Design a protein with these regions (language model features):
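N-terminal intrinsically disordered/low-complexity leader segments
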Residues: 1-9
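Amphipathic alpha-helical segments that line or abut small-molecule/effector binding pockets
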Residues: 80-98, 147, 151
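C-terminal peripheral helix-coil segments that are non-catalytic and often amphipathic
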Residues: 159-184
C-alpha cells in the first residue's frame, strides 16, 4: 500500500479495503479479482494501482492495520504481566472479530502470524531486552524464544477463532497462565 497523508488517497484506500472485506463475505478470497474489487469499491483501475499493487497488497494492508492495533496495546503495558499481555491479544481479536473470521474462513490466518514475526522482535528489542531473563540468553536463543512464544500464542488464538470464539477468553487465559507459572 502506498503510504500517504492525502485525504483523497486515504479515502480511496479505505474504500478498496472495505470492498475487499465485503466481497470476502460472499466469495472466497482466492477467487476474487481486482476487477471485482474495483466494481465493488466504485473506483477506477488507475486509482486502485495508485494505492495498491494487487489484492494481496490490500489484504496485507488490512493485516498490518490490525497488527498495529495489537502492538500499540502491547506498548501501553507497563509491566510484563501475562494477564495484560493476553488481554491485549484477545481484545484486538474480539474488536476485529469479523475480519479474523474472514481470514480463518479463507485460510489466511497465517498472514497474521507472519506479521507478528515481523512486529514482535522489534517490540522486544525496544522494550523487553532489559528483562533479567533475556540477559541470560544469547541473541540467537532470544530469537528462538520469541519465535516459540509467537507460535504458541498465535496457535491458541487461531484455535479460538476457528472455534468461533465460543470458549470464554478468561478460561483460556487462566489455563495458559497456570501452565506457564508451573512449567518453571
Amino acid at each position: 500500500m502506498t503510504e500517504t497523508k492525502n485525504p483523497s488517497a486515504i479515502y480511496s484506500q479505505t474504500q478498496i479495503q472495505k470492498a475487499l472485506l465485503r466481497l470476502m463475505k460472499k466469495n472466497r478470497y482466492e477467487n476474487l479479482t481486482v476487477k471485482e474489487i474495483l466494481y465493488e469499491a466504485k473506483i477506477a483501475r488507475k486509482t486502485f494501482y495508485r494505492n495498491f499493487t494487487s489484492k494481496a497488497d490490500v489484504m496485507d494492508s488490512l493485516v498490518k492495520k490490525t497488527m498495529t492495533q495489537y502492538t500499540q496495546k502491547l506498548l501501553q503495558l507497563e509491566n510484563e504481566n501475562l494477564d495484560l499481555f493476553f488481554d491485549a491479544i484477545f481484545d484486538v481479536v474480539k474488536s476485529n472479530r469479523s475480519f479474523f473470521k474472514l481470514l480463518s474462513r479463507n485460510n489466511l490466518l497465517h498472514l497474521v502470524s507472519e506479521e507478528l514475526n515481523t512486529y514482535i522482535p522489534v517490540i522486544h528489542d525496544m522494550y523487553f531486552s532489559d528483562c533479567s531473563f533475556f540477559k541470560t540468553l544469547s541473541k540467537q536463543q532470544i530469537t528462538f524464544v520469541i519465535a516459540f512464544n509467537i507460535g504458541a500464542i498465535w496457535n491458541v488464538i487461531s484455535r479460538w477463532i476457528q472455534e468461533d470464539m465460543k470458549t470464554p477468553e478468561e478460561e483460556i487465559k487462566t489455563g495458559l497462565v497456570k501452565y506457564l507459572s508451573t512449567s518453571n
